[in-house]
């Protein structure tokens, strides 16, 4: 019996955070035995916001090395760089022709990013969700791991796929309609200084973010200064409505140690101050990240191995993507290349 197909991507823009790890990359490693996984470093998506060429080049290699360091196995999964598979851009253009302007203008992420990058609101940023739809539909993905900020994009991908199928192949659909995959993760990884906001790798205030490759001393320092509250006496309790800062730290501690929230509350019952708890959270995060960092540095220095991973991944992805694109071109009426 064939495994369900999963597609997920990571952007090579900015340093990846522990939020990227706990919310996505750790699940990538865990899903490999039960799913047919297609994992992509989405450099085409990255340039919807202006990038320094040298920085993008290095960030793409960094992201690939991190994927390998967290346990993505190229023998189990297809790991590739998006721009190495031209079918993504080809199908993306075609799907533009089956997407309505009104649909794209309603995308909340476009509204947010266009406000942030007001001096560079380009067509690529507007059409970002269409390329994402192409990423998904090329591989017949049954499930797509998505966070709250990407749910709307997945819904659009479903709408585009359904529209195309109804026009050209209602009896024998070309595109699989993808479903969201909701990861089972305890941690809602929020900003360290304002736990009402999601931790973002692009946050201008670096005190809010812990990156995957962060120095251990810096991790400890940031956790020590993280938001808590002024409740007297101090109380370690998982309560997002009233204790967001503590709940955020509990989520990180749970993710790093495997302890439940109930176990954490019991362990720190009757604390006189938050300092010892923060110390334990920082040390747990360091212990979680140190082996990943060591493996990352080993892989990053082996460019020959990374080249081979990219080459094999692109070959595997292209073979599957080309099959889908051929079917699409045929039903649309394109003349095949002799």
Curated annotation (Swiss-Prot):
Q: Where is this motif: 'HIGH' region?
A: 12-20
Write down the top EC class of this protein.
Answer: ligase
Give the binding site residues for ATP.
11-13, 19-20, 147-149, 189, 198-202
- Main localisation: cytoplasm
Sites binding L-tryptophan sit at 135
**What Enzyme Commission number(s) does the record list for this chain?**
6.1.1.2
Keyword flag Zinc:
no
Biological role: Catalyzes the attachment of tryptophan to tRNA(Trp).
Entry's family note: Belongs to the class-I aminoacyl-tRNA synthetase family.
Output this protein's name: Tryptophan--tRNA ligase
The organism encoding this protein is Vibrio vulnificus (strain CMCP6)
Q: Name the gene behind this protein.
A: trpS
